[in-house]
């Protein structure tokens, strides 16, 4: 990625050196990575507070006006050129100082929201592929503590579908303290995080109400959703006030004002995305009179990814790979991603 903007800012290069792992780091030969909303948002500078449109408004050509100084997850400038890619499944092929050589040959998943890169202070983290180089390459280096061994019969493409989306969903579910028999509403349920949330909520034996486009409803039911509502319908008419315990929101946008009204007293609203637009209206009386909890979810404690690894190794989660591309087809992959005509993840495979 050479700068903020449209697809022209993505360059496929074959002349970059293989990274050298420094103290505490490992070098990973990448088997597969995956496309995520954050790749688009970082490319177009959507995280900048001066951008108020939905993601797709600038997804192809970028936005006319952004502020480079706050256009990243952490609110600091992105250093270009940047290798993106928030997901990575691969094999450790070299280690730096103070890392045991026994780790060479390990199959690993890289944690997306990395804490130990900066500090152990709570809520301080950076995003793999945004504030540091990521998995859209043949090789990547990370701190050894951020490369998690994985033992699974799934292939690299399937495993690469998990890190970013599933850790985001698991963190939201954990923060909301979803319990058996809770009713959970998931917006954007056919996307990477949304479809992950469907599986992870069902894993906790709670009821899932999913919102998605009509042509994806059957796939969401097959995935485990108990009820599916077509996107754009009046949610209060479908469900009634005070009908859900938790909202997992990845969309925001014009329909947002309905969400607090759907929550029961003491309910929790969690958010980790706003692809339909980040600016919403809230009647704060609904918030305090119903004793609601509003939870923004970015930072993830290490336990979230550790739990995700265990779920995968116990075959409790089903990977959703919609399509695979070679790494040099990254522009096509992002175009297809923005078209939203699939359920699950689009995978990028580097040359082997």
Regions found by a protein language model. Give the residues of each.
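Glycine-rich beta-strand-centered segment in the early N-terminal region that forms part
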Residues: 17-33, 48-114
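NAD(P)H dinucleotide-binding glycine-rich loop of Rossmann-like/cofactor-binding domains
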Residues: 63-83, 110-188
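Conserved "cap/hinge" positions at secondary-structure junctions
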Residues: 96, 112-114, 188, 212, ...
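Mid-domain Rossmann-like dinucleotide-binding core that forms the NAD(H)/NADP(H) cofactor-binding site
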Residues: 107, 154-233
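C-terminal hydrophobic helical "lid"/dimerization subdomain
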Residues: 171, 302-352
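Glycine-rich cofactor phosphate-binding loops and adjacent beta1-alpha1 units
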Residues: 209-212, 218-291
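Rossmann-fold dehydrogenase core element
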Residues: 267-272, 281-321
């Amino acid at each position: 990625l050479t700068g903020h903007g449209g697809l022209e800012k993505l360059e496929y290069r074959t002349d970059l050196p293989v990274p050298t792992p420094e103290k505490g780091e490992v070098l990973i030969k990448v088997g597969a990575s995956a496309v995520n909303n954050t790749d688009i948002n970082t490319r177009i500078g959507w995280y900048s507070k001066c951008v108020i449109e939905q993601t797709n408004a600038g997804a192809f050509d970028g936005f006319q006006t952004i502020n480079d100084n706050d256009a990243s997850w952490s609110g600091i400038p992105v250093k270009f050129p940047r290798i993106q890619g928030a997901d990575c499944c691969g094999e450790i092929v070299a280690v730096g100082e103070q890392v045991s050589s026994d780790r060479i040959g390990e199959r690993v998943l890289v944690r997306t929201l990395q804490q130990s890169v900066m500090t152990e202070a709570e809520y301080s983290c950076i995003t793999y592929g945004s504030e540091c180089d990521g998995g859209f390459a043949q090789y990547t280096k990370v701190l050894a503590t951020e490369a998690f061994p994985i033992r699974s019969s799934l292939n690299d493409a399937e495993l690469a579908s998990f890190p970013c989306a599933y850790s985001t969903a698991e963190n939201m579910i954990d923060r909301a303290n979803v319990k058996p028999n809770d009713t959970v509403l998931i917006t954007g349920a056919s996307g990477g995080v949304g479809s992950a949330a469907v599986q992870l909520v069902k894993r906790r034996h709670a009821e899932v109400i999913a919102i998605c486009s009509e042509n994806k409803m059957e796939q969401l039911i097959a995935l485990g959703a108990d009820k599916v509502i077509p996107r754009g319908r009046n949610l209060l008419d479908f469900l009634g006030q005070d009908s859900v315990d938790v909202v997992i929101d990845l969309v925001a946008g014009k329909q947002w004002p309905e969400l607090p009204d759907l929550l029961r007293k003491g309910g929790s609203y969690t958010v980790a995305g706003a692809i339909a637009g980040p600016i919403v209206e809230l009647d704060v009386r609904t918030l305090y009179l119903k004793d609601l909890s509003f939870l923004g979810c970015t930072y993830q404690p290490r336990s979230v990814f550790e739990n995700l690894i265990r779920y995968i190794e116990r075959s409790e989660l089903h990977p959703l790979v919609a399509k695979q591309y070679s790494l040099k087809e990254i522009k096509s992959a992002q175009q297809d991603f923005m078209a939203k005509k699939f359920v699950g993840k689009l995978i990028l495979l580097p040359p082997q």
